Amino acid sequence: MLPVQTSNLAAAFTDAVRALAPADAALPAVTFERPKAAAHGDLACNIAMQVARALKSNPRELAQRIVAMVQADPRAAELVAGMEIAGPGFINLRLTPAAKADVLRAVLSEGDGYGAQERGMHGNVLVEFVSANPTGPLHVGHGRQAALGDALANLLSWQGYDVHREFYYNDAGVQIQNLAVSVQARTRGFKPGDANWPEAAYNGDYIGDIAADFLAGKTVSASDGEPVTASGNPEDLDSIRKFAVTYLRNEQDIDLQAFGVKFDHYYLESSLYTDGRVEAAVQGLVGKGKTYESEGALWLRTTDDGDDKDRVMKKTDGTYTYFVPDVAYHTTKWERGFTKVINVQGSDHHGTIARVRAGLQGLDIGIPKGYPDYVLHKMVTVMKNGEEVKISKRAGSYVTVRDLIEWSNGGDETIRGCLDAGVADWPEHFTRGRDAVRFFLLSRKADTEFVFDVDLALKQNDENPVYYVQYAHARICSIFESWGGADWESRLAELAGTDLAAVTGADASPQALALGQRLAEFPEMLAAAAGELAPHAVAFYLRDLAGDFHAFYNADRVLVDDEAVKRARLALLAATRQVLRNGLAVIGVSAPRRM
């Protein structure tokens, strides 16, 4: 149902239950769900069973009394055609054809806004994701973060939040020093495996590319920074470090552009040190009595906030542990006015959650407990030609996002080849690969491990989930082209006043009714997915919607001689196409007109 329909019907049920309950009774919210069998109706409600004990009533008898009161409520009369009691006290409802038709009309009138809420009505939210170290190309784990984070940001935007996308660069610490030493070794002619190759060095081919460009004195720049020109001097380790970090940030920018992800802000870890924020956070915790010294180190009393043991903040060598700059960074999020913050990270960050939250609570600056929220994802395994792929020649030790996009795109075209050739619209050349990677990485819950099958991503049949969904959209477009010619979109307005009885009334096929019901679920599905921080639910929904469409297409011929039936079925398809477009837009996947 439409949100307003659900609200009115829930209000009718709630008022009925309240009239039967003691004045001081605590009542659960009334909810509706789709019955497992279509024969049981359009909706089911279990409120009678939920409150029977509190009302000291038999659930079935209570359900009968609720039904009688709801049937007399004018808010329900225009929505509900009939109600039946099943089993121990379920209330099954059949909706009126008018209520079903209102859904289709809402989709057609609201168009690209169907399912969306007014921007800003829920305040602002910061979503941090990807946040890779600038020490190498983005790997498939970063790709899963990018797909999850961007889809979640889109989802929250659809639900009325002002969304701020942020990338936190870990550009300080020992890994950056290892990067600089690795590039320096290549500038001196050493390679992985040589006796003089540094023990902690990075081995990918990209290190050699950076070294060659550094020796050539080239200039590189990242999307949010000043250009950096290489000194060309192999002994100038500071110049090598700055050049290498900026070079890799630019490479990551290219990967994100290919993936269709844009950030509002890039925050540098190094700035937390130069601005004195890390030291300020530490001194703030010391001043609040949340720390103590032991064995030459400074410890944070994280057990005060539920951690299993206290944690070292400052090691004996004077350096800070990993979570300390994270505490400082999150104080900036709070100070910038982001009262809701969501971090999308790998499951290997699980251990830092309690530490960061304990640090924020210890500062006692008004940050609520449980801040920030986290969405943690598990690892991705890549399969190609029936075998697991563990190593990329470019990266040296892992499969990159760029590899995955290029492999899933089909053909021999590469992103680097397009860039070197000066192809201005190069990202559009990789739409197929981008769509496949984004959809696939959202096709499982974040907390489950995922196997990315490149061979499956290349298939053009129903086995491929993104093809299955996109083909539903393309097939609808083909039907409309047969109906209205090349300019069919301009004729869709003709369907606005269509009599929809053929797809919502007594003579409508089960497939048409099921498709219409699925369209009605879209707004509430988005709201639930946003509330649960679960963008995978959108991908799940789109697969179900595509399945309902294909079932309808196989059951009901659309372009029939009966004009009233034809127009009603075209209106149903126009609504289906719109919801497919909207759902795909939420997860950042294209809706092609032809395939």
Swiss-Prot record:
A motif ('HIGH' region) lies at residues 132-142. GO terms for biological process: arginyl-tRNA aminoacylation. Its EC number is 6.1.1.19. Disulfide bonds: none annotated. It comes from the Bacteria. It holds the Pfam family DALR_1. It is found in: Cytoplasm. Keywords: Aminoacyl-tRNA synthetase, ATP-binding, Cytoplasm, Ligase, Nucleotide-binding, Protein biosynthesis. GO terms for cellular component: cytoplasm. It is an enzyme of class 6 (ligase). GO terms for molecular function: arginine-tRNA ligase activity; ATP binding. It catalyses: tRNA(Arg) + L-arginine + ATP = L-arginyl-tRNA(Arg) + AMP + diphosphate. The keyword Aminoacyl-tRNA synthetase applies. InterPro entries: aa-tRNA-synth_I_CS (IPR001412), Arg-tRNA-ligase (IPR001278), Arg-tRNA-synth_N (IPR005148), Arg-tRNA-synth_N_sf (IPR036695), ArgRS_core (IPR035684), DALR_anticod-bd (IPR008909), Rossmann-like_a/b/a_fold (IPR014729), tRNAsynth_Ia_anticodon-bd (IPR009080). Monomer. PANTHER family: ARGININE--TRNA LIGASE, CYTOPLASMIC, ARGINYL-TRNA SYNTHETASE. Belongs to the class-I aminoacyl-tRNA synthetase family. This is Arginine--tRNA ligase. It comes from Cupriavidus pinatubonensis (strain JMP 134 / LMG 1197) (Cupriavidus necator (strain JMP 134)).
